Curated annotation (Swiss-Prot):
Originating organism: Homo sapiens
Keywords: Acetylation, Antiviral defense, Autophagy, Cell membrane, Coiled coil, Cytoplasmic vesicle, Endosome, Lipoprotein, Lysosome, Membrane, Phosphoprotein, Protein transport, Transmembrane, Transmembrane helix, Transport
Residues that span the membrane, as ranges: 76-96
Membrane topology designation: Single-pass type IV membrane protein
Covalently lipidated residues, kind (Microbial infection) N6-stearoyl lysine: K64, K68
In-chain residues carrying the UniProt-annotated modification Phosphothreonine: T28, T48, T54
Record-linked InterPro entries: Synaptobrevin-like (IPR001388), Synaptobrevin/VAMP (IPR016444), V_SNARE_CC (IPR042855)
Changes after translation: (Microbial infection) Stearoylated By S.flexneri N-epsilon-fatty acyltransferase IcsB, thereby disrupting the host actin cytoskeleton.
Protein name in UniProt: Vesicle-associated membrane protein 8
Length: 100
């Protein structure tokens, strides 16, 4: 009788050990996943910082380019105004006979 009860006890101990091993494996997997997630978050943070620096550089460069083209436009408008003024001046001078 004692052997039968001991055999049942051994089975119960083995079952408990098996469950403990299963829980241990699950916990190990969970810890590994958490560590992997932490690494992924670190990688994403680094990417975000790089993108932020790149976007800041792009913003600065685009502002410089916009300013450069604005000045080109202003110079062109001033040049056109000067040419139109000179043409009008010649027309007025010819009309009044200043060159005769």
């Amino acid at each position: 009788m004692e052997e039968a009860s001991e055999g049942g006890g051994n089975d119960r101990v083995r079952n408990l050990q098996s469950e403990v091993e299963g829980v241990k494996n699950i916990m190990t997997q969970n810890v590994e996943r958490i560590l992997a997630r932490g690494e992924n978050l670190e990688h994403l943070r680094n990417k975000t910082e790089d993108l932020e620096a790149t976007s800041e550089h792009f913003k600065t460069t685009s502002q410089k380019v916009a300013r450069k083209f604005w000045w080109k436009n202003v110079k062109m408008i001033v040049l056109i105004c000067v040419i139109v003024f000179i043409i009008i001046l010649f027309i007025v001078l010819f009309a009044t006979g200043a060159f005769s």
